[in-house]
Design a protein with these regions (language model features):
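Non-catalytic terminal/linker segments enriched in charged/polar, low-complexity residues
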Residues: 1-155, 159-162, 167, 189
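P-loop/Walker A NTP-binding module and the surrounding RecA-like catalytic core of P-loop NTPases
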Residues: 111, 135-363
């Protein structure tokens, strides 16, 4: 009987050499793992992406109310403001100045704060209590939203006939690609024939994400191989979408900082190229902003609007953010309508923006 050391107590290199160990592992996976080699990092990332998109498209079991989604902003905004109104009775000058400080630190933007404060200050002589002051603040906020669009109709434009083109822009990390996927899914569910143009030719992951979203949403994607010019992608996409009778074309663009002048010029070029194919397009230039960016989101909005003539804003990641007041600043400081907000991961969590409901949820 062999009384030496057990084989498993010795490293494999003793028997097979370093190179041989790799061969043994390959044979092991081939024989005992169904003939499949270990999944590559790329395949694992794609699998995770597909899983994530599937989860976002699945029906929500617990639908979040807007009040629940905006709870952090409500605590940060009215929660801090109401602490300045302790004691009851009419609001005095000192309390009003404390409210002004809360407004300035709530990501509303300086112009918006000045307008709100002036409105409240003009009512100081009326000896308003805290409830009356809250109502006055609500009315002025809704007035700000009304000044940039119809507060009862904030939907993006879809033409009754012919092709509608939406151009979607924003910085990296704002949730632009995911938002495009959700928009496409919602349009498809409403009966529209939708195409997505993969105009972000700089980030490989963007193309992969859009392809997964297009498959899940059952919409077509135009993503030509070996084409690195985003304007060329946009040009051909508009031509193809028009020729084949699509209702809506959503053009993705490369995410870039609003301070990158050359890249912003490229976006201008894309818009001009789209107009060469369809003189009325793009019918919407949609800016996606991360609500957590706060004051920086207002700077982004100003720069993108100056360069491209933004027609509407989508604010993402509003749920769990204490900076939701930026929606008021987008309207008051930049003069742009907020059209939709993202309050969760699911497709239906990208919602049409109601200024009245929004104001009620934070005050």
């Amino acid at each position: 009987m062999y009384n030496g050391p057990m084989l498993e107590a010795l490293p494999l290199e003793v028997f097979f050499g370093v190179g041989g160990v790799f061969s043994v592992l390959v044979v092991y996976f081939a024989l005992f793992r169904g003939g499949k080699a270990p999944p590559s990092k790329a395949s694992q990332e794609l699998e995770q992406l597909q899983k994530t998109v599937a989860e976002k498209q699945s029906p929500r079991k617990n639908y979040k109310t807007l009040q629940e989604a905006m709870s952090q902003t409500q605590k940060s905004f009215w929660g801090r403001m109401s602490s300045s109104l302790v004691g009851g009775g009419a609001v005095d000058r000192a309390q009003l100045e404390a409210i002004e400080e809360v407004l300035y630190t709530s990501d509303l933007g300086p112009k918006t704060v000045q307008r709100l404060f002036a409105s409240l200050e003009s009512k100081l002589s009326q000896s308003l209590g805290s409830d009356a002051l809250k109502q006055a603040l609500k009315q002025e906020m809704i007035s700000i939203f009304s000044s940039v669009g119809d507060i009862n109709n904030t939907a993006f434009q879809v033409l009754p006939q012919g092709l509608t083109v939406w151009m979607v822009v924003g910085v990296n990390g704002a949730g632009k690609t995911t938002t495009i996927g959700k928009l496409a899914s919602q349009l498809q569910q409403s009966g529209k024939k939708v195409m997505i143009a993969a105009g972000d030719t700089f980030r490989a992951a963007a193309d992969a994400q859009l392809k997964v979203w297009s498959e899940r949403a059952q919409v077509e994607i135009y993503s030509p191989e070996n084409v690195k010019d985003p304007s060329a992608v946009a040009f051909e996409a508009v031509n193809k979408a028009q020729a084949r009778g699509f209702d809506v074309l959503i053009v993705d663009t490369a995410g870039r900082l609003h301070t990158q002048v050359n890249l912003m010029e490229e976006l201008k070029k894309m818009k001009r190229v789209i107009q060469k194919v369809n003189v009325t397009a793009p019918h919407e230039v949609i800016l996606v902003l991360d609500a957590n960016s706060g004051q920086n989101a207002l700077i982004q909005a100003e720069q993108f609007h100056q360069a491209l003539g933004v027609t509407g804003v989508i604010l993402t990641k509003m749920d769990g953010s204490a900076k939701g007041g930026v929606a008021i600043g987008v309207a008051g400081d930049v003069g742009l309508p907020v059209k939709m907000i993202g309050v969760g991961e699911a497709v239906e969590d990208l919602r049409t923006f109601s200024p009245t409901d929004f104001v009620d949820s934070i005050l």
